From Swiss-Prot:
Pfam families: ArfGap. The lineage of its organism: Eukaryota, Viridiplantae, Streptophyta, Embryophyta, Tracheophyta. Residues 133-166, 187-234, 278-303 are annotated as: Disordered. The modification N-acetylalanine is found at residue 2. InterPro entries: ARFGAP/RecO, ArfGAP_dom, ArfGAP_dom_sf. A zinc finger (C4-type) spans 25-48. This is Probable ADP-ribosylation factor GTPase-activating protein AGD9. Residues 133-153, 225-234 have a biased composition (Polar residues). Residues 204-216 have a biased composition (Basic and acidic residues). One of its GO terms (molecular function) is GTPase activator activity. It comes from Arabidopsis thaliana. Signal peptide: none annotated.
Amino acid sequence: MATENLTDKNVVFRKLKSKSENKVCFDCSAKNPTWASVPYGIFLCIDCSAVHRSLGVHISFVRSTNLDSWSPEQLRTMMFGGNNRAQVFFKQHGWNDGGKIEAKYTSRAADMYRQTLAKEVAKAMAEETVLPSLSSVATSQPVESSENGFTSESPKESSLKQEAAVVSSPKASQKVVASTFKKPLVSRKSGKTGGLGARKLTTKSKDNLYEQKPEEPVPVIPAASPTNDTSAAGSSFASRFEYFDDEQSGGQSGTRVLSHVAPPKSSNFFNEFGMDSAFPKKSSSSSSKAQVEETDEARKKFSNAKSISSAQFFGNQNRDADLDSKATLQKFSGSAAISSSDLFGHGPDDSNIDITASDLINRISFQAQQDMSSIANLAEETKNKLGTFASSIFSDLQDRML
């Protein structure tokens, strides 16, 4: 109960404030102080607490006795301190109630008083931590003896008896160990042989592995659909290492199975890998012959020509030339003379369109000269008008003054 009273903030401050010296401020003697300086254990008013707070926490640490929370060490410092003890200590070292607060609490006397309180509080807290531990040990030992009904030496005796019992019966333990090792580790037989049970192999797989015949490829049935894609898709399930080459000859379609290392049939990349099924072979051979013939004919025809146009190569130039010549002959069949404008379709108004750069510059410069002359004439006229107007005003002023 005593320790609980010491840690209770309200109880501690109620006892401390019951003393007459703690009912006034330590620095200014104001009544009912509600603040305190923890390092010195003194009570302060709110004004003096502000001054202490300005000094810094390394000199004075201020807390409220009503609002702030206090630790047991801080409460013990207030109990060891007090206004009366601090006042006596400062007077012994030459400090009275008057004077500056900053100089008072930064002096050597204030430092010594702060260290003295800190040492006393540390010593008291250490004694409090040692005494409760000793008392708890002293009270726990008789309780254990009363509950067990034996002294502290009884556990030792019981342990010795147990060790003797273990030593006296070594044969029994050996027998038990031997019996455990003699039991064979055999799995229990179950009535059912299904499920995950193991079965005995009738034949050896290693001996018969090389004697087995390779699986025969599934015979390929030609598809009845007209397209070649369905037949290739249906026969693709035969083997993983086989591919098919579709050929079309005489309107009949068929498939031919080739080995995996078949030699190349031709230099064509697509024919080598069986991708010529999409293009008929007869048409390709005929087209190649036609191309050879055309190239030979073109080489013979244009061997001496310096340049060749597409119209000449494909034979379309004669047709277009004949149409143009017929149109021009029909147009000018009854005329006595033909001009270039009539021949190329230019009208009489189109002759003014073709203007050279020099003509354009001459026209622009002539227009600019005309504009400048008109501007100069306008400026001359305005100058004359302003002169006549100014002279008339000046003459009127002279007449009025005279």
